[in-house]
Amino acid sequence: MMVFTSCVKTEYHYVDDSMKEWFVDRDKAVFQVGDQNDIKQDFLINDTLVDMIPAWSYFMFVKTDDDLCENIHQDGRVTYYQGEAYSLSITNYYGTSTHFSLYFYGVCFTLDVENGQFSCTECVDEKSLGKVVPCTLEMLDSHEVNGVTYHDVMHFKITDWDAVSSRNTFPSELYFAKHYGPIEYELGGTVRIKRL
């Protein structure tokens, strides 16, 4: 009778500190936004949650690796919107791939950092992916909103508005800054909202 034994090695894979800068800082987690009609609303970002996602590796039915991959999550709401308006997750998978996933008003922007692969998907909610939406992503050194210059900004823009649901809450454009989160966005292709 043969007995297989193994020494299971546990590896921890953490999100790089530079990626953590995309989360909204605690002291900036409550802010106001306003549109071109001077309608203002409060934006509240909840505390950041951190957990370790378990994963395993096997060789000939014997467990050899026990990986724990760090996942960081943050979500938020605005005053006049029913449901979650904002949700950001960043996960380090096995130390080889960092995934940036941003749910914003019904659209999921996903970026594989190491490979530079980007996708945009229409969502029913933050867990339910729908059809792919034509979209661009560019990284800006800075972007000015209401006289304030924000640095390290992601700029998402939907390039085919006809491909998106007709719901007026869908974002057609989003500027998202490190440490601050959403600083400017356009909903339904008509209402432009800026951080105050």
Feature roles, as predicted:
Residues V3-S6:
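C-terminal motif of bacterial Sec signal peptides marking the signal peptidase cleavage site
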Residues V8-L196:
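Conserved functional acidic sites
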